[in-house]
Amino acid sequence: MLNIKDNERFAVFIDGSNFHSTFKSLGFDVDFALMLEELKKTGRLVRAYYYTALPHDGDFAPIRRLADWLDYNGYTVISKQTRDFYDSATGSKRTKGNMDMELALDMLKLAPHIDHAVLFSGDGDFVRLIEEMQNRGLRMTVVSSTKTKPPIMADVLRRQTDDFVELDDLRDLIGRPQRDDDGDDDYIDDGYDDDDGAVMLDDRRRT
C-alpha cells in the first residue's frame, strides 16, 4: 500500500475533511477498518491519527458516530468543536473548524519517535511542515489525488514530499463495496455530506 521499509517506525496523520473530499471526488468510500489492516502490514505503525472538527450541538451527528467508531477501533481521534461566525460579505452564518494546527503540532511532537510520517491530505498549507520533518531526518509520504477535478493535491506539496501515493490507486485495497439500496447496518456514515445536515468543516486549499 505504501513504500514503508520493514524496520521503519511510522505514523499516519489523516486530515479528515480533506481526505473525505478526495475519496468522494474519486467516487468511492473508504473502509477505515480495512485501511488500518493494510497499514499494519508493513513497517511498525506507531499511531494512526484522525483529525476532525465536530459541531457543538451534534451529539448525534453522523460525523460524531464516525469519530466514536474510529476511536474504538485503532485510530487516535483528535477533534475540536466548530465555530460559527457571521460572513459580512454574504450575510450568512458560516461554520469553521480547521484542524491544521493540531495535526502539525502532533506530527512535530512525535517526530523523535518515528522514522517516517504519512500525511493523508492534499492541503498545500502543510508544505512547510513536511519540509521541517525532512530537516529533522524523517521520510515523508503524502496520500492524495491529482485525478480529481480540480486536483485536490497541491502541486507544492507533491514536489516537496519524498513519496506521493495516488489515492485512486488504493481504491481496490481500502475502498468500501457499493451499498445496496436497502442500506447496510455495518456502514459508518462519514458525516461530512451536506445532505446529511452536516457542514463541510474545512476548506480545501490548492496551491
Language-model-derived ranges and their functions:
Residues 1-207:
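Terminal and domain-boundary accessory regions
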